[in-house]
Amino acid sequence: LESSGLYVNRDKFIGKIKHIDDDNLTYTNYNIFTLTGRPSNAFGGTNYAALGKADGSRQCFVSRFTDGVLYQFDYDAFHIRIVADLLRYELPSTSVHMWLAQQYFNVPEVTNEQYNESKQISFTNLYGSSVNDSETIDFFSRTYEFRRLLWASAQKNNMIKSPYTNRKILLENITDVSETKIFNYLLQLLETEHNISSIHSIMKYMNQLKSKMILYTYDSFLFDVHPDEIEHMKEIKSILEESGKYPVRVEKGLTYHSLS
């Protein structure tokens, strides 16, 4: 993944990317040796995990291929789905955020404003304190019970560990340790384990293709796609979604900035 590089259009280069080679490529550098395993990604003074649209720093990244296009896949409500997997809780096949918004606002039809607000409510409910009477929602009621049990186990054993790989995070390495922080760290750990497995499958599939996976950021995957290989993005989507278990949103564009 790191060796793929991101192609830079020098005409739109704003000076933030310091290291560009003679082929107009700049490279990422992932560090997975963090507390939760969630990789940082900085190289040459550029934090690729924090490239934003507001300052135009994404505008310079384009396809290296003539008539190529950038594709991005983003998981929908990823941590909520990871929690549901832990709880063996069956979520609806429709939008999770829409489903939760209907319960937050007690309405059958959700407005765009309510939908956007529900995402923030869910974020607070998952990582912080309970709002909007979320304890009355079955999914969050079970989530909070799991969180309490996780906290009790962590205090007893001085650690948390992945139920899938048994990777451990010691409490002594966590500053200001709390029930919510422990839960958040577990989700980051499970997110990373899941994504590394998916990336391995994707790289294996793309081994004989010209197209390249060029950037991974938490729940997002960016690809530089050759014009003759657009159809292969369907298989990439299938690998990521795991038969619909983890739906993704697909965006494409000529620049990293203009994805839609």
Predicted regions and their residues:
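Amphipathic, charged-and-aliphatic alpha-helical interface segments
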Residues: 87, 112-127
